[in-house]
């Protein structure tokens, strides 16, 4: 590594793992209200809402956030943030941080180029691994985001994040913390493939054709394209996942039952409820995360090189 710039030194797996989790947490801090708005729009129309909650109608991303602030207070768009950050540190670290390592594992020996099939396999693998580890944090995050508290006198089911884990495990069993794992694995396999493979390919082509250098504009364009593709392919699964994870025991027999009830009761357009906030969320999140991730990798490699330098 002597004589090389930090940007020229291949980052280690540990650097990618730490950088991905940190960058994802930073992206979540900036975009969490958009995610909460998406969840509220996705569950709107369900029959489980209280009478007071049914009177609230959410219209659009900004309208949803403003309605939440007006009826529930300024902190409401950040309900579930702690669980969200816990999720990203375990979830993004695996699905993004380990993507290159798994891609290299699937690449045939002697080949210096990864095929699209190899990249898709890597995306599916790290996405499934991440869900297996982070599912309880996702369940708690969605429960907080979906809960409506109209004033100081309203009942709060959970007093805090740790209480939510305990309450769900006590009332629904440990399996309650893993509710919706199958649709979530499906969703994140799709999202991870769309995000990572699209980002990988766009960035590779921009560099191969010398359209851009490996810097901010290249990362920005690649991340935006990744966010758009991920939203288009993942929205239907995302809506089913949100509805199923937020549902009380007995409302849906399975994710498939949830999907069928959505079609019969609300029509096929229900699968794209919250599409705009989903795109704003994923698009913005991808831009912030990937740009931060690329810079963090370089910064961490620079620190590592300084520590290893004899002078």
Swiss-Prot record:
GO molecular function: oxidative phosphorylation uncoupler activity
Transmembrane segments: 11-32, 77-99, 120-136, 183-199, 217-236, 271-293
Chain positions covered by the region annotation Purine nucleotide binding: 278-300
A UniProt-annotated Pfam family: Mito_carr
PROSITE patterns for this protein: SOLCAR
GO biological process: adaptive thermogenesis; mitochondrial transmembrane transport; response to cold
Keyword Transmembrane in record: yes
UniProt membrane topology term: Multi-pass membrane protein
Solcar repeats: 11-105, 114-205, 214-299
InterPro entries in the record: Mit_carrier, Mito_Metabolite_Transporter, Mitochondrial_sb/sol_carrier, Mt_carrier_dom_sf
Compartments (UniProt record): Mitochondrion inner membrane
Membrane topology (Mitochondrial matrix): 33-76, 137-182, 237-270
Coiled coil: none
Signal peptide: none
Record keywords: Membrane, Mitochondrion, Mitochondrion inner membrane, Repeat, Transmembrane, Transmembrane helix, Transport
Segments on the Mitochondrial intermembrane side according to the record's topology features: 1-10, 100-119, 200-216, 294-311
One Gene Ontology cellular component annotation held by this UniProt entry: mitochondrial inner membrane
Free-text function comment from the UniProt entry: Putative transmembrane transporter that plays a role in mitochondrial metabolism via an as yet unclear mechanism. Originally, this mitochondrial protein was thought to act as a proton transmembrane transporter from the mitochondrial intermembrane space into the matrix, causing proton leaks through the inner mitochondrial membrane, thereby uncoupling mitochondrial membrane potential generation from ATP synthesis.
Protein family per UniProt: Belongs to the mitochondrial carrier (TC 2.A.29) family.
PANTHER family the UniProt entry points to: MITOCHONDRIAL DICARBOXYLATE CARRIER-RELATED
Subunit structure as annotated in this protein's UniProt entry: Interacts with HAX1; the interaction is direct and calcium-dependent.
Name of the protein: Putative mitochondrial transporter UCP3
Taxonomic source organism: Canis lupus familiaris (Dog)
Protein's gene: UCP3
């Amino acid at each position: 590594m002597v004589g090389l710039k930090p940007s020229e030194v291949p980052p280690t797996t540990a650097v990618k793992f730490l950088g991905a989790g940190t960058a994802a947490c930073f992206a979540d801090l900036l975009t969490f209200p958009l995610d909460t708005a998406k969840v509220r729009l996705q569950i709107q129309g369900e029959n489980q809402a209280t009478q007071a909650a049914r009177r609230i109608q959410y219209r659009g991303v900004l309208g949803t956030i403003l309605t939440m602030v007006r009826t529930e207070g300024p902190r409401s768009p950040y309900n579930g943030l702690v669980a969200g950050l816990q999720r990203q540190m375990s979830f993004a670290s695996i699905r993004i941080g380990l993507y290159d390592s798994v891609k290299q594992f699937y690449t045939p020996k002697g080949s210096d180029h990864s095929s699209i099939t190899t990249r898709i396999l890597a995306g599916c693998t790290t996405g499934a691994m991440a869900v297996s580890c982070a599912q309880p944090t996702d369940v708690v995050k969605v429960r907080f985001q979906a809960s409506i508290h109209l004033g100081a006198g309203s009942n709060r089911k959970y007093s805090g994040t740790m209480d939510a884990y305990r309450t769900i495990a006590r009332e629904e069993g440990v399996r309650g913390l893993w509710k919706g794992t199958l649709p979530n694995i499906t969703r994140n396999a799709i999202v991870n493939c769309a995000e990572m493979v699209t980002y990988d390919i766009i960035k590779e082509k921009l560099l191969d054709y010398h359209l851009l250098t490996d810097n901010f504009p290249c990362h920005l364009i690649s991340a935006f394209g990744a966010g758009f593709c991920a939203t288009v392919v993942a929205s239907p699964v995302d809506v089913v996942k949100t509805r199923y994870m937020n549902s009380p025991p007995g409302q849906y027999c399975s994710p498939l039952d949830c999907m069928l009830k959505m079609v019969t009761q609300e029509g096929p357009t229900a699968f794209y409820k919250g599409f705009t906030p989903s795109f704003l969320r994923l698009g913005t999140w991808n831009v912030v995360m990937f740009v931060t991730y690329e810079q963090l990798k370089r910064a961490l490699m620079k620190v590592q090189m300084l520590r290893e330098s004899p002078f």
